[in-house]
Amino acid sequence: MALARWLWVVAGLVVTIVAIGGITRLTESGLSITHWSVVSGILPPLSESAWQAEFDLYRQTGEYRLESGPAGMDLAAFKFIYFWEWFHRILGRVIGLAFLLPMMWFWIRGMIPAGYRGRLLALFALICGQGALGWYMVASGVGTDLTDVSHFRLSAHLLTALFLLAGLVWTALDLRRLARVPDARPARFTGVAWMASIILFIQILLGAWVAGLNAGHASYSWPMMNGGLLPQPDLTRGWLWALTHDPFLLHFLHRWWAWVAVIALVVLARKVRPFDRRASIAVHSAFGTMVVLGIATVLSEVSLWIAVAHQLTGALLVISTAWAAHAIGTARKTEAA
């Protein structure tokens, strides 16, 4: 049971860093630190000259030259965006240590059950990979004329974090069940779980692209978009480019694919209800809140804290989906036995 509690704590930290990552993106803070220093980067600049040096590095980015600079950014404003990127990176280091040190302790004491060492190592590899992927994302906006990081790399960074979150939750649930039933075997992923997960994956991918392309600003009305229902996509470069780059089309797809996700999640919630009523309620509550916050984000013209709450609820939706999928997978195994 101690291992399960530990993984729940790490999962809570991942939810927190997802929210902080949302703030970092929405405040345009991601390119404020233009280098990656694993050790020396732990501390922020401690003198005015050090702050000025960091600001000078940021002023070389396309974001500053084309957006922040013309908007009149000064050193005080730079310190604000620097804080969020620095905090995001620090929290990433905390997550790494919060996973590695207890894992080593449990490993040395022989407390990790058979069959789980490889899974825990895979989760730790995902955590390390997140750090590398985060820098790979930032690097896409450094030394170029881009005013934002690549939305493809941004989506990979977010989706990997949420995959890690689901893995932590799933493993914690397996370990909790094992502590209660010594001969329990890991839950399996069922067909309905695959269906709901794939549809939710597409919705989160679209949401990440919307965030990365600032496509939330394409329309501030709902359900219509700027007076119309269907978008008029930019097809000058073909449909593939439009489906991956056109802000208006991606905004449209994100807001309406959400209803496909709702249907899939309702099916999942109904399937799990006989086995775990709380998981069913969690799924319904999470997607209901997600939809309301998504609409509120649009109508508020992408208010920072509403948009952050929308992303935070997305992480909670991933947790509730993993919980429901695990409950169904556990019940199916029990029935088969």
Swiss-Prot record:
TM region(s), chain numbering: 3-23, 94-114, 120-140, 154-174, 191-211, 248-268, 289-309, 311-331
Pfam families for the chain: COX15-CtaA
Any single GO CC term annotated in Swiss-Prot or TrEMBL for this entry: plasma membrane
Record EC number: 1.17.99.9
A GO biological-process term: heme A biosynthetic process
Membrane topology: Multi-pass membrane protein
Compartments (UniProt record): Cell membrane
Keywords of the record: Cell membrane, Heme biosynthesis, Iron, Membrane, Metal-binding, Oxidoreductase, Transmembrane, Transmembrane helix
InterPro entries associated with the record: COX15/CtaA_fam (IPR003780), HemeA_Synthase_type2 (IPR023754)
Catalytic reaction equation(s): Fe(II)-heme o + 2 A + H2O = Fe(II)-heme a + 2 AH2
Cofactor(s) listed in the protein's UniProt record: heme b
Binding site residues for heme: H254, H310
Alphabetized GO MF terms: metal ion binding; oxidoreductase activity, acting on NAD(P)H, heme protein as acceptor
Pathway: Porphyrin-containing compound metabolism; heme A biosynthesis; heme A from heme O: step 1/1
Statement: the UniProt record of this protein carries the keyword Electron transport: no
Top-level lineage group: Bacteria
The keyword Transit peptide appears for this protein: no
Subunit structure: Interacts with CtaB.
PANTHER family: CYTOCHROME C OXIDASE ASSEMBLY PROTEIN COX15, CYTOCHROME C OXIDASE ASSEMBLY PROTEIN COX15 HOMOLOG
Matching HAMAP family: HemeA_synth_type2
Function noted in UniProt: Catalyzes the conversion of heme O to heme A by two successive hydroxylations of the methyl group at C8. The first hydroxylation forms heme I, the second hydroxylation results in an unstable dihydroxymethyl group, which spontaneously dehydrates, resulting in the formyl group of heme A.
Similarity comment: family membership: Belongs to the COX15/CtaA family. Type 2 subfamily.
Name the UniProt record assigns to this protein: Heme A synthase
Originating species: Erythrobacter litoralis (strain HTCC2594)
